[in-house]
Amino acid sequence: MSDKSNIATLDSTLIDRLPSSSKTLFEAKATKSLTFESIAQELGRSEVAVAALFYGQAQASAADIEKLSQILEVPQSKLEAELGGFPDRGRAGPMPPVEPLIYRLYEIVQNYGYAYKAVLNEKFGDGIMSAISFSTKVEKEVDEQGNNWAVITLRGKWLPFSRF
């Protein structure tokens, strides 16, 4: 359990654009005062991946559904019905850029943006990551099979919103 002020909840303005599973998952998460990190530890997944599940931007495996049912105390049959299909990603976003690489970066933000926001808010509170006090790096990795992987690191100063 965690401090309720650090628990990411579902923005009600998004409900109509998200799958029904989002409301189910977020309500149970809030009721149990769980963070994405604590749920991720139980699922054996990253917290961003778990947040993406909650926003309907990632596919849940049968094992994910079974474990989420236990953690959140939501009937497994309900989660199977709501999470059993393929995700309908990126529905809330505007028309994307057309340049292929930029489009892929935009696609990452579409698919994981709300998940990142939720996890960042849980870790830092209400605020934004600066794109001015900011650094990024791109690295190339080659795996054991010889496949190339792009590694993009984003590092931004956390700027809390001011109360006025």
UniProtKB/Swiss-Prot annotation:
It comes from the Eukaryota. SUPFAM superfamilies: Cyanase C-terminal domain, lambda repressor-like DNA-binding domains. Keywords: Lyase. Belongs to the cyanase family. It is an enzyme of class 4 (lyase). The keyword S-adenosyl-L-methionine does not apply. GO terms for molecular function: cyanate hydratase activity; DNA binding. It catalyses: cyanate + hydrogencarbonate + 3 H(+) = NH4(+) + 2 CO2. Its EC number is 4.2.1.104. The active site is at residues 104, 107, 130. GO terms for biological process: cyanate metabolic process. This is Cyanate hydratase. InterPro entries: Cyanase, Cyanate_lyase_C, Cyanate_lyase_C_sf, Lambda_DNA-bd_dom_sf. The keyword Lyase applies. Catalyzes the reaction of cyanate with bicarbonate to produce ammonia and carbon dioxide. NCBIfam families: cynS.
